[in-house]
Regions:
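Long hydrophobic alpha-helical segments that form multi-pass transmembrane helix bundles
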Residues: 123-208
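Cytoplasmic-side transmembrane-helix entry/capping segments in multi-pass membrane proteins
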Residues: 70-80, 97-103, 118-129, 222-230, ...
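Membrane-interface helix-loop-helix junctions at boundaries between adjacent transmembrane segments
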Residues: 84-153
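Cytosolic-side transmembrane-helix boundaries in multi-pass membrane proteins
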Residues: 1-23, 293-333
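Structural signature of hydrophobic alpha-helical transmembrane segments
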Residues: 41-54, 92-101, 193-204, 246-258
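N-terminal signal-anchor module of multipass membrane proteins
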Residues: 1-56, 60, 330-333
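C-terminal ends of transmembrane helices
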Residues: 9, 57-69, 106-117, 209-218, ...
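Loop-to-transmembrane alpha-helix initiation sites
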Residues: 120-124, 249-258, 279, 298-310
Length: 333
C-alpha cells in the first residue's frame, strides 16, 4: 500500500472531478475554436489539430516510457494544453515548430515537474514563450483573417498591439486612428490590415461566451478574469486621459491575447492562487505587468510573460494570503 502524502495547506475539496473541470474548459473553448476556423480557416484547423495531437502523444510517450507510469490521457489536460498552445500561435506557423513547442510545453512545462498538479507554470504558456524566444520571426508573422483556404502562403498584416507600440515609441497619437473601432475588435476585425493575430485571440466575444459558460458551470470563479480585465481597463484608461498617445481602454482590452489569457490561462487551477483574496491580488498584478510590458517592454504583447511571472509568485500568495484558522488569535508580544 502506498503512503498518502499530504502537501502543505491550503487545501480545497469539491465534488467536481478533474475530468469534469477539464472537459468543461474544452467545451468553453468551442466558441473561440469555431471563431478561429471562421477567421483563419484551414490554417487554424491545421495548427490546432497538430498542437493537440503532439501534446497528447508526448504526454503518453513520456509517461509510459520515461516515467514508467500509467497514462492519464482521459483527464483531458493534454488536450487543453494542446488547444491553448495552438490558440497562442499564428495560423501559418510551420508544423515542425508547433511540434517543438508541444514537446517543450509537455516535456519541460509539465512532465518534468511530475505531471498534472505539480507544474508551477502554465504548460501552454511555457511552450508559447519558448517558441517566441526561439523563433521570433515565425511567431510574429501574422496571417490576415479571412483567408479561409490559406496556410503557409497567407498574407501577413500588422496587429493592433503593434500599432499601439509604434504610437508610443514615436509619440504619434495619429497612428491610433488606424485601429478598428471597439465593436469591430470585439467581434474580430477583418480587412487588409487587421484581424491579424494568433488563432485564438482575434474574436473577444467568443472568448467571453466561454467565460460565461465556465462561470455558469462553476468551472472557475470571476475573481481572476475580472480583476485582470478591470485592472488593464482602468489603468489604460487613466494613461489615455493623461496622454492620447496611449490607446483607449476598449482597444487595449479587446486586442492581443488579453481575453484569452485572462479567461483561459491565468485561471489554471494548478498555477493560480486558491483563495479569493489571493486570486484578486494575482489578477491585479497580472494586469499591471501586462500594461508595463505592452507599453515599455520589447514585445508588443505582455500577457504570457505576466502570467508566467505571477505563476512563480503563486506559492508565496498561497502562503501569506490564506483564511485565518478558527479560534486563532495573534500571539501576545
Amino acid at each position: 500500500m502506498s503512503k498518502l502524502i499530504v502537501s502543505l495547506s491550503p487545501h480545497a475539496h469539491g465534488k467536481e472531478s478533474v475530468e469534469k473541470n477539464m472537459y468543461g474548459v474544452i467545451i468553453a473553448l468551442v466558441p473561440a475554436i469555431l471563431a478561429s476556423f471562421y477567421f483563419f480557416g484551414l490554417g487554424s484547423a491545421v495548427v490546432l489539430l497538430t498542437s493537440v495531437a503532439a501534446c497528447v502523444f508526448f504526454e503518453w510517450a513520456i509517461t509510459k516510457y520515461l516515467l514508467k507510469e500509467e497514462t492519464s490521457l482521459l483527464d483531458g489536460s493534454a488536450i487543453i494544453t494542446g488547444l491553448l498552445l495552438g490558440m497562442n500561435l499564428p495560423s501559418n506557423l510551420p508544423l515542425w515548430i508547433i511540434i517543438i513547442g508541444a514537446l517543450f510545453a509537455i516535456g519541460v512545462g509539465k512532465m518534468s515537474f511530475g505531471g498534472l498538479g505539480n507544474n508551477p507554470f502554465n504548460p501552454a504558456l511555457v511552450g508559447r514563450c519558448f517558441l517566441l524566444v526561439s523563433f521570433p520571426a515565425q511567431m510574429t508573422s501574422w496571417p490576415v483573417a479571412g483567408q479561409m483556404l490559406s496556410y503557409t502562403d497567407a498574407t501577413t498584416g500588422a496587429t493592433p498591439l503593434a500599432i499601439m507600440k509604434t504610437a508610443i515609441k514615436t509619440g504619434d497619437a495619429s497612428l491610433l486612428n488606424q485601429l478598428p473601432d471597439a465593436m469591430s475588435m470585439l467581434f474580430g476585425a477583418t480587412g487588409d490590415t487587421f484581424g491579424a493575430g494568433t488563432t485564438g485571440e482575434v474574436c473577444a466575444v467568443a472568448l467571453l461566451l466561454g467565460l460565461v459558460y465556465m462561470l455558469w458551470k462553476k468551472v472557475i470563479t470571476w475573481h481572476i478574469p475580472v480583476s485582470i480585465i478591470a485592472t488593464v481597463f482602468v489603468f489604460s484608461g487613466l494613461m489615455h486621459l493623461a496622454n492620447p498617445v496611449y490607446a483607449n481602454p476598449f482597444a487595449v482590452i479587446f486586442s492581443g491575447g488579453l481575453m484569452l489569457g485572462a479567461i483561459f490561462m491565468a485561471t489554471d487551477y494548478v498555477t493560480s492562487p486558491m483563495t479569493h483574496k489571493g486570486m484578486l491580488i494575482y489578477g491585479v498584478c497580472i494586469g499591471l505587468l501586462t500594461i508595463i510590458i505592452r507599453n515599455w517592454g520589447s514585445y508588443p504583447e505582455g500577457m504570457s510573460f505576466a502570467i508566467l511571472i505571477m505563476n512563480a509568485f503563486t506559492p508565496l500568495i498561497n502562503t501569506y494570503v490564506k483564511p485565518k484558522r478558527f479560534g486563532e488569535k495573534p500571539a501576545k508580544k
